[in-house]
């Protein structure tokens, strides 16, 4: 089975990358994150509803080919997401939905980041500052405008409605 990367699959990989569960291929987190991952996995036909396993804070399924593909994309993220396009936007939106935060002061950060993530953001033109395992974006509005059409978990956040008002 040959698996091909699509923008929608890039979003799922971004979610999985920051919130992966130890069992199978899945994520752990709050209800909205689990619901989004489940819906995306079913919509992309990664699995069927009877093979989707859930616990209190995890949702996952077993599929060796997809697991290997997700791991390959993770290892090659600097090459696969080197352009400002729909693939990169979906991947970063998935990462932001899984581990991103906008504070009350408007600081945009992504938790659970490593040097490879920092390099990916820098290559795409997003200046960052790393503080322990968090990555703070220097120009948050540019980043949020780039991913706003692709976020699913955090799409109701007030910062995205602010961006829509500012655009008009």
Residue positions per predicted region:
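Internal intein/HINT superfamily modules and their associated LAGLIDADG
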Residues: 1-168
């Amino acid at each position: 089975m040959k698996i091909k990367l699509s923008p929608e699959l890039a979003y799922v990989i971004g979610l999985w990358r920051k919130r992966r569960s130890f069992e199978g291929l899945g994520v752990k987190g709050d209800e909205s994150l689990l619901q989004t991952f489940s819906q995306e996995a079913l919509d992309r036909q990664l699995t069927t509803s009877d093979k989707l396993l859930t616990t209190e804070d995890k949702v996952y399924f077993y599929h060796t080919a997809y697991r290997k593909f997700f791991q390959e994309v993770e290892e090659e993220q600097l090459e696969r997401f080197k352009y400002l396009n729909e693939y990169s936007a979906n991947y970063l939106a998935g990462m932001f939905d899984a581990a991103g935060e906008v504070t009350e002061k408007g600081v945009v950060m992504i938790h659970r980041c490593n040097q490879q993530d920092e390099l990916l953001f820098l290559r795409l033109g997003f200046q960052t500052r790393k503080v322990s395992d968090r990555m703070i974006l220097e120009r948050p509005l540019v980043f949020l405008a780039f991913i706003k059409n692709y976020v699913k978990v955090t799409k109701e956040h007030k910062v995205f409605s602010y961006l829509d008002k500012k655009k008009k």
